[in-house]
Structure formats: C-alpha cells, structure tokens
Amino acid sequence: MKRLLKILILLSLTTPVSFAKTYQPVPSTVKLPAKYTQEYIDSISDEYKNVSDEQIFHVALDMLKGTSGDFSRKAILGYNLTQYPVKVMFKDLSEINEAYSTFDAIGWKKKGKLYIYINPKHEYAPPGAIAALLAHEAIHQDEYNSLSEETYAWTMEAVVWTEILKMFPESNNLESALVTRENILKQLLEKGNHTNKYIKKTVYANEGYKNLPLTSPGFSNQ
C-alpha cells in the first residue's frame, strides 16, 4: 500500500501542468465599440493565439469579419501561400532598416513565414484603423511586389476602412495618426467614385515605390 502511494505521488509530481495562455489586454486608453467587452475579447482570443499575444490585434481581426477584408483575416490565420499563421506585432521598424523608420507598417517574410510589423506609434490607435491596415498588409504574401500589388492593397485598405466606419463609427478618432491615414485613403476612394483611380495615381507617384515593377505574381496592371 505504501509503495502504491509513493508511485501515485511520483506520478502527480511528474504530470505536466497546463496553464491558460495569457494575453496582453487592449490598452485602457483605447476606446472600443460596446460589443468588445473584456469577456467577449477573451472569448475570441484563442482563435488568434498563433497570430499575436496582444488583444488589440484580436479585436482588429474580429472587426474584419463581414468586410471585404475577411480574406485578409483568413490569410493572417494561415490561409496564405506559406500555410502558416502570420505573426503580427508592434516593432520599431528602424531595427529592420533605418529607411523604414517612418513607415506605418511593413509585411516581412523570414525563413518561410510571414510577419506584419506595425510602427509602435500606432499602439493606441483604434482597432478599426488597425484592421484596415492589416487588410492591406496581408495582401503581401511573398518576396515580390509591384505597383499593381500596392494599388490593390491600398485600395483594399480604403474599402475596408469605409466599411468599418459604417459598422463601428466610433473608430474615427481624429487624434490618431493612423486614422488620418485611413481618412485620406477614404477620400481618394470617394474622389474616384469608389474606384482605384486616384489611389493608383498616388501609388505610382510614391517615391518609395519608384523601383517597383509594374506587375507581380497574381497582380496585373488594372
């Protein structure tokens, strides 16, 4: 009997202990739509646990449901060319390249996996604006890029932002630099009668894109 008790004690000591995954909550200064209570956010976080530990990204991705950016949401979850979830995080972009220091975000591929790095200056941006940005960056899934691909991605961002404002108008926090970006894109979309006409002109005039080819795999000139 004593021997059996010792065995049971040893088994209990060697049994792996599982802990619930912990997430970084949305900053308290970020205003969320009423739908996004902490209880609701916690209920969706497991779906995005392989993407990020930061719940502000979980909220942003959830906001893409029912928008034109749901394709991007699914791509971030792993339905992309690599078949792996995209890792999303805030990161000082100058650590990658000093030339990226003022960028809002970049998509990156490393060792066969995709990453979306967002400038930390947007840590307190409305999740709806982050959602539109993610819809853009998730379009880039390989090492290639082009003017046509950027035109498509910027247009997608503008369309998604327009849709999110209809669903979550409180996302339009004019104190946010990211919201300023999104509203400029929205204006270009509307100016072109909801076509890419003026967004395309802006992309082609962007000094940072001057060395890009016209097309890339999956993106023809339109």
Regions found by a protein language model. Name each.
Residues 36, 41-115, 173:
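Auxiliary, metal-adjacent structural segments of Zn-dependent hydrolase domains
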Residues 11-18:
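Hydrophobic h-region of N-terminal signal peptides that target proteins for export
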Residues 51, 124-129, 133, 147-148:
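Soluble non-cytosolic domains of exported or imported proteins
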Residues 190-222:
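Pan-zinc metallopeptidase signature
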Residues 2-10:
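Sec-dependent signal peptide recognition
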Residues 145-184:
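Post-HExxH zinc-binding segment in Zn-dependent metallohydrolases
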Residues 132-144:
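Active-site recognition of the HExxH zinc-binding catalytic motif
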